[in-house]
């Protein structure tokens, strides 16, 4: 409920306006029926005056005008609440603990957010607000006006409510099981769809698409079949209510004919008021069923929103030192049962150019993520300058660190946005930097130039172009520590050599840490650190290691082959 309360508070004024309008409109709708009784009886006994007709006309005018005005807060809240829940998910991603984020599959997460946002909107808007401003006031006013006409009919009404309650509980049991199956099938379907979209080449070349499409079709059939069943049960509610109202309508006509106690106007009013009294009950049962089902989707969404945050992003000390000087002592890191870094110690001086080299799974990337504060170490000490990493505010740290991963951190936007984000930089400066990374031809050959959209994850660019565009961003960042995690792996040897020469010239006064598998690219680094099974097993210059370290020679020879 915490997040629902948060969104209610955010939209507080419009919620109050919406509830107020709903209660007023419910009263006017029922009062209109009550007054219509007087008009009919006035016509029947020829006592109707012009004032009565004019008053009824005014009531109709108010009713229709207020219903029209009601659309504004209704749509504002309906769409706003849904998007507010989606914004909550984006805010969550911005502060979520990195290890929790790693456990989430993109396809399932997208479906969970989509379903959860819609469910949150339905719980708050379609159920609670509908109940408070529409259903309860309409039932209350209807019963009051029915009681004014004939108390006995009111008692019959309550008997009908009891029948409905029993019927509802029977149907609900079936609906819960069906909805749970739909949720699981939708997440599975989205998992297959996203996997197919993201891994097109892998599945095409391995001829896996027929199998993937078959699995997706099976999930689709389950969803369609379950939704049809659910819809039929929903419609059963309305059919039962329609039959019950029909029985009551006939009963009122029979009662009026037999007792002669009701006027024509009273009969007409009772029939209309009974429909007013029962329609909200029919609606309530349907939205209550949906509410219970939506709670299952919303619970999954809440579980995501409730995942552990990285509190260090906002908490901690402001940095008052150069983070390019690093001291690591007896560092250990364990993920679940696996020890990835074991008693590691390392010192890096300000401005030093360091390369991490080793087999896959030797701990290089894990150490990088620890230095970035993404992973929290179990034992040991990591000092940036003269400050312990655990005590630093990470948002403050990220102002001083540049990080480029192997996956080329470019995003769906323009070339300009990928270069400078929202910074104000002249076009000449940007073009100059693109020349440094051998990308000027890209802009010159495009009609939109720097404003060209590069597509999701840079799909309009080659792997090497994406990496060069990401590297160009370094020219516009005022960092003290630069970390490159195989940031040139998609480039050819000649391009990599020329681009890295420009990058290292630009970074000459900064500390640079690079992970590399292509060892010739780090030949000019001050020091190379060798990793194996979570430990440092050697270090030195490229030439020293090439002639004295058998492990490095094995890595180099394997790389050359």
Task: For the regions a language model picked out, list residue spans one by one.
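A short amphipathic helical element positioned immediately N-terminal to and/or at the very start
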Residues: 1-10, 109
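ABC-type nucleotide-binding domain
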Residues: 321-561
């Amino acid at each position: 409920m915490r997040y629902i309360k948060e969104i209610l508070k955010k939209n507080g004024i419009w919620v109050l306006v919406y509830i107020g309008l709903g209660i007023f409109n419910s009263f006017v709708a029922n009062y209109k029926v009550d007054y219509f009784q007087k008009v009919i009886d006035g016509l029947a006994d020829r006592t109707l005056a012009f004032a009565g007709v004019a008053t009824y006309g005014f009531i109709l005018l108010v009713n229709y005008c207020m219903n029209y005005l009601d659309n504004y807060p209704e749509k504002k809240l309906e769409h706003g609440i849904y998007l507010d829940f989606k914004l909550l998910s984006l805010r969550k991603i911005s502060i979520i603990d990195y290890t929790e984020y790693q456990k989430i599959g993109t396809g399932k997460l997208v479906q969970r957010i989509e379903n959860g946002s819609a469910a949150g909107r339905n719980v708050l808007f379609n159920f609670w607000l509908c109940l408070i401003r529409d259903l309860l006031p309409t039932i209350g006013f209807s019963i009051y006006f029915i009681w004014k006409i004939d108390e006995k009919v009111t008692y019959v009404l309550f008997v009908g409510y009891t029948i409905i309650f029993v019927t509802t509980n029977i149907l609900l049991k079936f609906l819960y099981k069906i909805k749970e199956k739909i949720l699981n099938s939708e997440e599975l379907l989205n998992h297959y769809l996203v996997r197919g979209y993201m891994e097109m080449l892998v599945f095409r070349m391995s001829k896996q698409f027929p199998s993937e499409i078959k699995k997706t079709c099976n999930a689709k059939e389950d969803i369609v079949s379950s939704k049809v069943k659910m819809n039929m049960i929903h419609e059963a509610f309305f059919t039962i209510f329609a039959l019950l109202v029909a029985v009551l309508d006939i009963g009122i006509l029979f009662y009026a004919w037999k007792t002669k106690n009701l006027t024509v106007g009273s009969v007409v009013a009772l029939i209309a008021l009974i429909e007013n009294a029962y329609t909200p009950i029919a609606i309530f049962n349907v939205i209550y069923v949906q509410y219970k089902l939506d709670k299952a989707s919303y619970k999954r969404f809440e579980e995501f929103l409730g995942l552990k945050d990285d509190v260090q992003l906002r908490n901690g000390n402001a940095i008052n030192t150069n983070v390019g000087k690093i001291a690591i002592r007896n560092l250990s890191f364990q993920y679940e049962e696996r020890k990835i870094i074991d008693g590691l110690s390392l010192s890096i001086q300000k401005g030093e150019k360091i390369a991490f080299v080793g087999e896959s799974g030797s701990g290089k990337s894990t150490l990088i993520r620890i230095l970035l504060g993404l992973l929290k170490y179990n034992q040991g000490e990591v000092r940036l300058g003269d400050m312990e990493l655990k005590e630093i505010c990470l948002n403050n740290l990220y102002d001083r660190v540049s990080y480029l991963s192997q996956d080329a951190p470019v995003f769906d936007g323009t070339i300009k946005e990928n270069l400078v984000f929202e910074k104000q930089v002249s076009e000449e400066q940007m073009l100059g930097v693109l020349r440094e990374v051998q990308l000027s031809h890209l802009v010159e050959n495009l009609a939109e130039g720097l404003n060209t959209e590069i597509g999701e994850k840079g799909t309009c660019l080659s792997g090497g172009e994406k990496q060069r565009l990401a590297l160009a961003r370094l020219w516009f960042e005022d960092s003290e520590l630069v970390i490159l995690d195989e940031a040139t792996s998609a480039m050819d040897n000649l391009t990599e050599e020329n681009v890295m020469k420009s990058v290292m010239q630009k970074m000459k006064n900064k500390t640079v840490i690079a992970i590399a598998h292509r060892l010739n690219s780090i030949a000019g680094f001050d020091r190379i650190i060798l990793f194996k099974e979570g430990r440092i097993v050697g270090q030195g210059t490229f030439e020293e290691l090439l002639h004295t370290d058998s492990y490095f020679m094995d890595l180099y020879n394997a790389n050359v082959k």
